[in-house]
Curated annotation (Swiss-Prot):
InterPro entries (alphabetical): ACP, ACP-like_sf, PKS_PP-bd, PP-bd_ACP, Ppantetheine_attach_site
Highest taxon in the source lineage: Bacteria
Family to which the UniProt record says this protein belongs: Belongs to the acyl carrier protein (ACP) family.
Modified residues (O-(pantetheine 4'-phosphoryl)serine): S37
Xref: PANTHER family: ACYL CARRIER PROTEIN, CARRIER DOMAIN-CONTAINING PROTEIN
GO cellular component: cytosol; membrane
Any GO BP annotation: lipid A biosynthetic process
Name of the featured protein: Acyl carrier protein
Classification via Pfam families: PP-binding
Compartments in which it is found: Cytoplasm
Lineage, uppermost ranks: Bacteria, Pseudomonadati, Elusimicrobiota, Endomicrobiia, Endomicrobiales
Function: Carrier of the growing fatty acid chain in fatty acid biosynthesis.
MF (Gene Ontology): acyl binding; acyl carrier activity; phosphopantetheine binding
Amino acid sequence: MADFEARVKEIIVEQLGVDPAEVVTGASFVNDLGADSLDTVELVMAFEEKFGIEIPDEEAEKIQTVGSAIDYVKTHVRK
């Protein structure tokens, strides 16, 4: 399968309109990348659509950094 990290970062850049250099593993969507609550919901929806997964609300709330998004996708996408 394609490199999940690169694909997740690409989605974040597209959704948030941020510089790719800012999208590092430890970056917080809200604190570092300037996302608001609507942006984070849209990010989760984009991950669901692009990777064909369903992210329950309680899990979505835990996805707050680039790294946590990558880890979630890697764990839940069928190989």
